[in-house]
């Protein structure tokens, strides 16, 4: 037996122990790495909600719990961090987060993350969401001072639930802070009429009935900020009027008594009276048996004759205030193109009067030819804001900010539109006899919205009208507040309420440092704006400023136009809407992150908002089985429903009108996905997924897998796959990439 001496193995043990210590020290050092991201809030107003998307370099963050926000003094402030996407399949680390916080007095903040960092969960105020998924259930949101409920369905059921109003069925405001009681109810919703899209045709007016079918807590819902998606349909009495889908996203905030409502409707009417042929247009045919003959269409006057028009569109609340109500609003003193100062207005409604604020402008339906400014002078006398008691003389100006308050001596409701002027016509109306407050995205007090063509000529290669299936999203603010000094905590409660909604109408813009966006490589290799290439940067700035200048000079405003740009300048006139060709909105997002310029952010947001809705086809969709009922029969009933349009998710071609020409390749989702990442806009990803589904269906056969259809689809699918990790989209993308590679050798 060998005699092993201790000294013969001692050096090995010491060596292994040393390696172990060094390894753990290296691990400790690696874990202690932290990252600091400078964030600036432009045009800051303290205590304003801030939501921004921040990209994270690959391999540096695996949990959103390891992220916090510091103020300008290095102190952690309450924040809500949401994991949005990862670097998969390359790496399981986080690629995008949403950072939410309320701004403070200073403009500068730091987002900090690392393995030794934890979010302190410093929540002195939180909100809660209870979402009952039953067919006659409801969603209840409680922010602390505000509680509201949205009912689902047409009523009845096991609990004999009331029919939904289509919007907020009950709103309570707890000014005393002692819990919600019966006398805290400040507004309710009229059954099926708190959300409306009324259609007018030759048979007369057909008022809608709104039915909520589904409520969802969106990604990004947490203790400080909730996003509630409300899906439903408008139903009509006459069978010739198709049901129309709507989606609302309601944003609520901890400790706040205001909400932001993003209201999206889809137009499902028959836009004009031309004689329809059976079949499809040659440019977008999915078969070869039935092809439309466009020759007789050129002689059909029905294209210029409106059929189903929008008579009224908007939201309504029935307020529960005292009889001694007063209404407040304001308008700008200057010309429409130079709004600087405002004049305030208030009057008592005496329990029976109605009051409205209406913003109008030229060519409401925006059917060409469009009236615009000349080369050297602005348009004059074409925009009008009017306000006053209904039935009496009204005051007028050219432009109004777009808010109204109805209040008694204790409580009030203030409602406002984003882009009240730019997306005219809009109206805010209070009827103190009926106790209703109406926010009209399209008011019945102007001519109905028409979707007819300007003529029956060819427009971008087609004689067609594809208005059926377009959508539009409108943003509104609803603020429920106290009106006396004690309940509001303000020395001037009405002024502060107005200032609050005006801040929310044009909120501050949060932006991480351009260097961080570049370092993350979330957008690939990207150079930030720099003096190193001053001449190049100057040319870029001139291009973007020139586009903004023309948008505001002409102006390219109106509900169906705002966010888009005309393309060609010929014989002193701008012509042909761009319709996002090619990815115009995306370049604004890129320039925003390169520079931090808040003006670029606002144009990017408006451009994406327009193109994803107006410049796309959204209806009729294939039936979707959600599975929110207990009966298995429902799945088979859904499957037996007719299939939708093959063109869902396909964009529109540049044309003189937004809805007169389609082409299979013409859709660009990069800006929409960027709005989802950078701005938390769920609508952007929602519409991008419509395009992904369109690719998966391959409705154009081999045609859709060649030429620019192929390379544009690869770009679009790459953006959507990165955001969703959907295996069906991934398989479609990889097959198309393989085809594109093979074409290099064939």
Where are the regions a protein language model picked out?
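Well-ordered alpha-helical scaffold segments within catalytic/enzyme domains
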Residues: 264-268, 477-482, 584-598, 613, ...
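Long, well-ordered core segments of solenoidal/helical folds
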Residues: 539-552, 604-619, 682-703, 731-746
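Bacterial N-terminal signal peptides
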Residues: 11-23
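Solvent-exposed beta-hairpin/edge-strand motifs
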Residues: 55-75, 317-329
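An acidic-aromatic substrate-binding cleft motif
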Residues: 120-159, 163-166, 171, 332-338, ...
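Solvent-exposed beta-strand/loop surfaces of large extracellular or lumenal domains
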Residues: 70-97, 453-455
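Solvent-exposed loop and edge beta-strand segments that line ligand/cofactor-binding
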Residues: 459-461, 465, 569-581, 651-665, ...
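Beta-strand/loop-rich accessory regions of lumenal/periplasmic or secreted enzymes
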Residues: 138-512, 557-560, 576-579, 663
């Amino acid at each position: 037996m060998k005699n092993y001496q201790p000294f013969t193995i001692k050096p090995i043990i010491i060596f292994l122990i040393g390696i172990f210590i060094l390894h753990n020290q290296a691990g400790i050092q690696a874990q202690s790495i932290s990252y600091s991201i400078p964030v600036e809030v432009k045009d800051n107003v303290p205590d304003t909600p801030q939501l921004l998307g921040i990209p994270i370099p690959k391999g540096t963050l695996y949990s959103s719990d390891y992220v916090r926000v510091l103020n300008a003094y290095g102190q952690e402030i309450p924040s809500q961090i949401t994991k949005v996407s990862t670097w998969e399949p390359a790496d399981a680390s986080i690629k995008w987060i949403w950072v939410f916080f309320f701004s403070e007095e200073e403009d500068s903040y730091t987002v900090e993350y690392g393995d030794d960092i934890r979010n302190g969960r410093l929540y002195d105020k939180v909100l809660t969401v209870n979402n009952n998924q039953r067919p006659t259930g409801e969603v209840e949101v409680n922010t602390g001072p505000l509680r509201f409920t949205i009912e689902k369905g047409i009523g009845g059921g096991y609990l004999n639930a009331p029919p939904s109003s289509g919007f907020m069925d009950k709103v309570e405001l707890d000014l005393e802070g002692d819990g919600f009681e019966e006398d805290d109810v400040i507004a309710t919703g009229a059954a099926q009429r708190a959300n409306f899209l009324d259609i007018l045709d030759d048979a007369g007016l057909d008022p809608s009935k709104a039915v909520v079918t589904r409520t969802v807590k969106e990604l990004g819902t947490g203790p400080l900020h909730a996003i509630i998606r409300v899906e439903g349909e408008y139903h009509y009495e006459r069978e010739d009027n198709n049901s129309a889908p709507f989606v609302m996203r309601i944003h609520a905030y901890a400790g706040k008594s205001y909400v932001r409502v993003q209201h999206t409707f889809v137009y499902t009417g028959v836009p004009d009276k031309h004689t329809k042929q059976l079949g499809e247009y040659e440019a977008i045919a999915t078969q070869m048996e039935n092809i439309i003959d466009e020759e007789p269409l050129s002689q059909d006057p029905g294209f210029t004759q409106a059929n189903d028009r929008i008579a009224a569109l908007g939201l309504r609340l029935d307020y529960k205030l005292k009889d001694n109500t007063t209404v407040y609003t304001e308008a700008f003193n200057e010309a429409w193109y130079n709004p600087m100062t405002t004049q305030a207005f208030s009057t008592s409604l005496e329990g029976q009067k109605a009051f409205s604020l209406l913003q109008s402008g030229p060519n409401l339906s925006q059917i060409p030819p469009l009236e615009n400014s000349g080369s050297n002078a602005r348009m004059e006398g074409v925009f009008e804001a009017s306000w006053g008691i209904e039935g009496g003389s009204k005051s007028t100006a050219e432009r109004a900010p777009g808010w109204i308050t109805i209040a008694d001596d204790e409580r009030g409701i203030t409602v406002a539109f984003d882009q009240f002027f730019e997306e005219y016509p809009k109206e805010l109306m209070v009827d103190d006899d009926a106790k209703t407050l109406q926010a009209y995205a399209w008011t019945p007090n102007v001519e109905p919205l028409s979707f007819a063509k300007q003529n029956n000529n060819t427009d971008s290669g087609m004689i067609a009208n594809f208005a059926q299936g377009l959508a539009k999203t409108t943003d509104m603010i609803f603020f429920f507040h106290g009106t006396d000094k004690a309940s509001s905590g303000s020395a001037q409660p009405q002024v502060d309420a107005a200032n609050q909604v005006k801040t929310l109408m044009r909120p501050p813009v949060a932006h991480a440092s351009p260097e961080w966006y570049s370092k993350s490589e979330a957008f690939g290799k990207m150079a930030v704006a720099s003096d190193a290439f001053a001449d190049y940067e100057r040319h870029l700035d001139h291009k973007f400023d020139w586009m903004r200048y023309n948008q505001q000079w002409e102006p390219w405003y109106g509900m169906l136009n705002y966010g888009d740009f005309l393309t060609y300048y010929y014989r002193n006139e701008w012509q042909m809407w761009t319709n996002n060709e090619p990815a115009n909105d995306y370049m604004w997002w890129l320039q925003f992150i390169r520079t931090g310029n808040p003006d670029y952010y606002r144009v990017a947001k408006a451009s994406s908002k327009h193109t994803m809705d107006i410049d796309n086809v959204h209806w009729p969709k294939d039936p979707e089985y959600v599975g929110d009922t207990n009966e298995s029969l429902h799945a088979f009933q859904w499957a037996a429903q007719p299939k939708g349009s093959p063109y869902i998710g396909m964009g529109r071609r540049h044309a003189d009108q937004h809805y007169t020409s389609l082409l299979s390749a013409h859709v660009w989702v990069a800006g929409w996905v960027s709005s989802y990442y950078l701005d938390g806009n769920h609508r952007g990803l929602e519409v991008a997924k419509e395009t992904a589904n369109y690719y998966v269906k391959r409705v154009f056969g081999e045609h859709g897998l060649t030429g620019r259809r192929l390379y544009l689809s690869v770009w679009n699918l790459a953006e959507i796959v990165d955001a969703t990790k959907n295996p069906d989209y991934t398989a479609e993308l990889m097959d198309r990439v393989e085809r594109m590679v093979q074409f290099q050798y064939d």
